[in-house]
């Protein structure tokens, strides 16, 4: 007995099984975590090292190169990118997709640890980290301000930050605008030398005086007590009274230096609406839950209000949980609207309330089933997985439509009883229903097995589509026949075609008769349309990597010139601030200022509250911002913590750094006049101005000292000495580093630098100018390499012409300069990702088409028939191309997903036609009658399934809600591709069938004739 038969005969059992699955599905749905995008495994590991005060050249040779060379034994490396800059080294290791990144982190840590002793002693230990798509992404930004900033700083550092760091799912808590406290022993070089002290000697005296020592144990009978010498000091006046010398006269620290409680030189300041603020940025871990994390974080902040300094105010400037809830809500809303529209279409065709409700029940049940499957494999509720469900809103009813339509045929044409019709009608089409669903499912199977970003990003969507189609099959061959046997009757099934459909059918039959009579012209027209569309259409379209979304926020980022101090950075920031503040749509803005860059994040309100898009607002701001000098700007439609990413990154590579720099400057100059590019920048920054201290080695040798003594002395005066081994001032709530250095005004005076005293012996000092010369020079700001080859990167944002056009322009300018063979180019950033991902999806599409062919060949037991059916796929591309042109939709990664989806959907109409034609011919009808009758009788179900899919995706294509830009391109692709393909398939496929059938018949006849002639010759010869 078939599954349909069991379901019909045991309705209670079937109902309870369905209810159980629905219950499990609902339970799974409400327990799944919500995220904006899936958890993506990006095989990237970073190695970061800081070396305070070191210039880029020294960082490159003494840190970066040694770390890179240590990785030679690590396997599966795709590329290594390095950046050596003032005071820091960054090594980014990209691995092949599919590797265990955690294992690679362990390997790298092991290899780097082997060369740690070879690194400069004052360089910090390299930090090895795995990069996750989710880790490091900001989930919330909270701005605090208070009149008592010192107390606020202490509260955030000592109380709030530890509480936030203890939350489940937290990745990192970053604080900006709160420079660390320092107890500075501010010295005067001449005064120290007067007391026969060098800064190193003074600091060693201080450190010895405040050190806690373990003394041992004291046993008193039955107890052992640990003895500790407590040298730590916890008051500033205690430091001032530290005894320096008691030879003759008592000398205390306050006699030779000023003890000042201050802060370190600020490197990052925060402002909220122009007011000095402390900014707290939260990011989640790779397995964290944004919604749960933000909720817990905001609850902690609310609970800690009583502990905040008086007058403290705070404002939540970014809450990504709102974006997640809003985006998911809009996708869900689009799905519901699509369901309503699909139901209306069904009713318009069926004209039966019972039948419409019966088919419409299949969709929500199948979707709820799907949640159970997705939950079992750990999928989150995100934009991608929900999109996979939403695009099936119209398609998931197709299986039920086929089943009900065949039950209808058994009741009305074969006069079968309802129970018998439900069972037999379902059994007849079970195989075709499964085959039809499989064509949709198999197109997404390749994505699951092709390593790369495409698999990581679209894995959840693939599973959602596969599982939802699987659930739809189960519902169609169990629940639908069971309900049909109980609720349908002969009266409810008898309907007549409406007047509109009769006109459509009559018009279609005229067209198909003409096409059948003019097969050559019909095929020529279709081929011409295809090639015309392929060659002309793409030239009218723009290319992007990912769809750009209007989330009501944007950021303005400015890269400052090398050597910019914090005060100048603040002045420049105020100019940007005035531009953003005076933009009419600005509701709130947050500003982060450092010596290297400025970031202003602005909130312009929800999409539906304004007429202008966020991109129009950004363009207005960009035009005004061009007038501000001393910085390069870049705008993004997302909040930023100070780092900017561009649409296009053009990498010029070569073994000679000076050569590629000169070449890069020429290309940059040419591109500056191109209107299609905005926010143009490069790594060709002017070098950092250096004061190079050149030691006279003969002189210092004559004094009996070495260069290290001079370097250490200057390091203490300027930087504060050895920060890895500092003394501390311990209070009740914090530990404050104690440093020896010059006062700030003297640290910025070159004359004082030249006159610093260097101790060369007991009571013997010389001026720096006596043993060294100081000269100005321009040092390299950054040294960029990719796989050990010097690289100059030119980056830009799209000014409205599309990424492909910008790429072509960059290549054109590159070639126009006749580059030598030693210089080459490549792509980075989003451009590289776009090329790789598009290539992966194209490869996946090729495999998908082969799988469809294999499936159809198995179904029809023919190698020729699937070729005819697959002919409907190119027809879909005609609709896709002109649909994108009409709607002004760029070609992006979501459009490619729509094309892959189409490959599995559009063939279903051709399958229906060919299958029915074959059925008619097996019943003894001639070819022409079989074709014409099949076209007439299959028109209604083909149009019905097409229109339910098209109207089911219409809300997504309209793109009205938050985040709708993300899936709009895919919906447009499916709607136009399926619509055009259906119209053209109804005409071309019957013609192709006839042409191929005539050809194969003639070929078989010819082979038989040749065979018969051979046999006759053999008989005659015999």
Task: Give, region by region, the residue ranges found by the protein language model.
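Signature of alpha-helical transmembrane segments and their immediate interfacial
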Residues: 1-34, 427-429, 496-545, 602, ...
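Extracytoplasmic/periplasmic membrane-proximal domains and adjacent transmembrane bundles
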Residues: 6, 37, 45-48, 90, ...
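Transmembrane helices with small-residue packing motifs
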Residues: 12, 19-55, 113-122, 167, ...
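Hydrophobic transmembrane alpha-helices and their membrane-interface caps
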Residues: 25-31, 340-348, 353-409, 467, ...
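Flexible hinge/switch segments at interdomain interfaces of large molecular machines
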Residues: 35-45, 81-87, 122-146, 174-180, ...
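Solvent-exposed, membrane-proximal periplasmic/extracellular interface segments of envelope transport
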Residues: 59-131, 190-211, 232, 567-644, ...
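Helix-loop junctions and hydrophobic alpha-helical segments within the transmembrane domains
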Residues: 317, 324, 328, 404, ...
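Transmembrane alpha-helices and their membrane-interface boundaries in multi-pass membrane transporters
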Residues: 393-407, 430-449, 456-496, 600, ...
């Amino acid at each position: 007995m078939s599954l349909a038969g069991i379901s019909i005969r045991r309705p209670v059992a079937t109902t309870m099984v369905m209810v159980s699955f629905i219950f499990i599905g609902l339970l799974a749905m409400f327990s799944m975590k919500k995220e904006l995008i899936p958890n993506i495994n990006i095989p990237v590991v970073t190695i970061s090292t800081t070396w305070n005060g070191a210039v880029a050249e020294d960082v490159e040779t003494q840190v970066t190169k040694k770390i890179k060379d240590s990785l030679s034994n690590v396997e599966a490396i795709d590329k290594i990118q390095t950046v050596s800059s003032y005071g820091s080294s960054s090594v980014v290791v990209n691995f092949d997709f599919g590797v265990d990144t955690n294992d690679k982190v362990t390997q790298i840590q092991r290899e780097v640890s082997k060369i740690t002793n070879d690194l400069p002693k004052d360089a910090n230990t390299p930090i090895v980290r795995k990069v996750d798509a989710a880790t490091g992404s900001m989930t919330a930004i909270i701005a605090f301000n208070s009149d008592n900033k010192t107390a606020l700083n202490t509260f955030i550092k000592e109380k709030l930050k530890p509480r936030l760091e203890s939350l489940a799912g937290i990745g990192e808590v970053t604080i900006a605008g709160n420079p660390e406290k320092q107890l500075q022993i501010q010295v005067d070089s001449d005064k120290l030398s007067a007391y026969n002290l060098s800064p190193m000697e003074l600091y060693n005296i201080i450190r010895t005086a405040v050190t806690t020592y373990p003394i041992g144990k004291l046993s008193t009978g039955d107890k052992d007590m640990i003895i500790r010498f407590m040298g730590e000091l916890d008051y500033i006046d205690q430091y001032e009274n530290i005894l320096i010398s008691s030879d003759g006269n008592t000398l205390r620290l306050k006699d030779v230096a000023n003890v000042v409680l201050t802060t370190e030189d600020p490197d990052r300041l925060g402002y909220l609406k122009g007011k000095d603020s402390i900014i707290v940025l939260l990011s989640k871990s790779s397995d964290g839950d944004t919604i749960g994390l933000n909720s817990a974080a905001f609850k902690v902040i609310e609970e800690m209000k009583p502990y905040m300094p008086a007058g403290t105010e705070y404002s939540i400037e970014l809450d990504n949980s709102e974006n997640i809830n809003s985006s998911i809500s809009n996708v869900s809303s689009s799905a519901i609207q699509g369901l309503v529209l699909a139901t209306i279409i069904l009713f318009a065709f069926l004209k039966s309330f019972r039948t419409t409700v019966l088919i419409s029940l299949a969709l929500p049940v199948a979707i709820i089933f799907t949640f159970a499957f997705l939950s079992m494999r750990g999928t989150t509720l995100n934009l991608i997985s929900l999109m996979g469900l939403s695009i099936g809103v119209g398609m998931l009813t197709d299986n039920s439509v086929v089943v009900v339509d065949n039950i209808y045929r058994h009741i009305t044409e074969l006069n079968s009883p309802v129970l018998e019709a439900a069972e037999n009608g379902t059994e007849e089409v079970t195989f075709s229903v499964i085959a039809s669903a499989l064509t949709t499912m198999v197109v997404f199977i390749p994505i699951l097995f092709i390593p790369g970003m495409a698999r990581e990003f679209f894995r959840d969507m693939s599973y959602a589509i596969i599982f939802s189609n699987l659930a739809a099959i189960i519902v169609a061959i169990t629940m639908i026949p069971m309900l049909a046997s109980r609720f349908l009757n002969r009266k409810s099934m008898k309907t007549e075609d409406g007047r509109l459909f009769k006109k459509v059918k009559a018009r279609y039959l005229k067209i198909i008769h003409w096409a059948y009579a003019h097969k050559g012209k019909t095929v020529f027209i279709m081929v011409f349309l295809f090639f015309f569309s392929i060659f002309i259409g793409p030239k009218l379209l723009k290319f992007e990597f990912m769809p750009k979304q209007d989330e009501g926020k944007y950021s303005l980022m400015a890269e400052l010139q090398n050597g910019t101090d914090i005060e100048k950075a603040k002045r420049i920031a105020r100019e940007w601030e005035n531009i953003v503040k005076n933009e009419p749509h600005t509701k709130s803005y947050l500003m982060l200022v450092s010596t290297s860059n400025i970031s202003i994040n602005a909130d312009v309100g929800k999409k539906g509250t304004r007429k202008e898009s966020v991109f129009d607002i950004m363009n207005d701001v960009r035009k005004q911002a061009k007038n501000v000098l001393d910085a390069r700007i870049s705008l993004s439609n997302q909040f930023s913590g100070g780092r900017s990413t561009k649409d296009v990154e053009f990498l010029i590579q070569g073994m000679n750094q000076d050569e590629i720099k000169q070449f890069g400057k020429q290309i940059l100059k040419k591109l500056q006049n191109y209107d299609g590019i905005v926010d143009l920048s490069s790594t060709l920054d002017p070098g950092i101005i250096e004061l190079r201290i050149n030691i006279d080695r003969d002189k210092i040798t004559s004094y009996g000292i070495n260069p290290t003594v001079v370097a250490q002395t200057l390091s203490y005066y300027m930087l504060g000495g050895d920060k890895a081994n500092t003394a501390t001032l311990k209070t009740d709530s914090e530990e404050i580093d104690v440093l020896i250095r010059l006062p700030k005004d003297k640290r910025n005076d070159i004359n004082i630098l030249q006159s610093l005293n260097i101790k060369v012996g007991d009571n013997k000092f010389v001026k720096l100018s006596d043993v060294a010369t100081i000269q100005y020079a321009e040092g390299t700001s950054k040294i960029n390499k990719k796989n050990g080859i010097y690289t100059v990167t030119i980056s830009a944002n799209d000014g409205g012409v599309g990424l492909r056009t910008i790429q072509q322009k960059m290549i054109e300018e590159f070639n126009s300069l006749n580059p030598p063979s030693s210089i080459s180019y490549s792509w980075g950033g989003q451009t590289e990702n776009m090329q790789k991902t598009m290539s992966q999806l194209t490869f996946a599409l090729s495999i998908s088409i082969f799988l469809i062919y294999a499936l159809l060949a198995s179904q029809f037991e023919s190698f020729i028939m699937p070729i005819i059916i697959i002919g409907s796929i190119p027809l879909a591309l005609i609709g896709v191309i002109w649909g994108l042109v009409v709607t002004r939709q760029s070609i992006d990664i979501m459009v490619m997903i729509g094309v892959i989806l189409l490959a599995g959907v559009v063939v279903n109409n051709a399958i229906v036609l060919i299958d029915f034609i074959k059925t008619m011919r097996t019943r003894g009808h001639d070819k022409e009658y079989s074709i014409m009758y099949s076209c007439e009788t299959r028109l209604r179900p083909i149009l019905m399934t097409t229109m339910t899919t098209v109207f089911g995706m219409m809300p997504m294509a309209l793109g009205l809600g938050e985040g709708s830009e993300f899936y709009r391109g895919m919906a447009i692709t499916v709607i136009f591709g399926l619509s055009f393909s259906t119209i053209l398939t109804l005409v071309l496929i019957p013609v192709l069938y006839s042409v191929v059938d005539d050809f194969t018949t003639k070929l078989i006849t010819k082979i038989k004739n040749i065979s018969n002639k051979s046999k006759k010759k053999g008989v005659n010869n015999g």
